[in-house]
């Protein structure tokens, strides 16, 4: 299983609509609206890199999505 964060830049005014579309995408474990450089951070859980590519492709086709940056989680430490 591969876990990754997909960091998303949105056009203003499209966040709520985009979230509704993202909720339809398989492999997304969490969607967070954040302040700062990015507007939305999504956590994806996929079987392989090909599936991750398909997931990011689906996100990139959503209206208002300007740019995505994907960060694959190499190691996670539970506190």
What do the PLM-derived regions correspond to, one by one?
Residues 1-79:
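A compositional/biophysical signature of low hydrophobicity enriched in polar/charged and small residues
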């Amino acid at each position: 299983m591969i876990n990754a964060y997909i960091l998303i830049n949105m056009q203003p005014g499209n966040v709520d609509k985009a979230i509704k579309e993202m909720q339809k995408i398989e492999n997304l474990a969490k969607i967070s609206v954040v302040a700062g450089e990015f507007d939305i951070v999504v956590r994806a859980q996929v079987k392989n890199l090909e599936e991750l590519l398909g997931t990011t492709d689906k996100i990139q086709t959503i209206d208002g999505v300007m740019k995505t940056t994907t960060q694959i989680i190499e190691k996670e430490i539970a506190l």
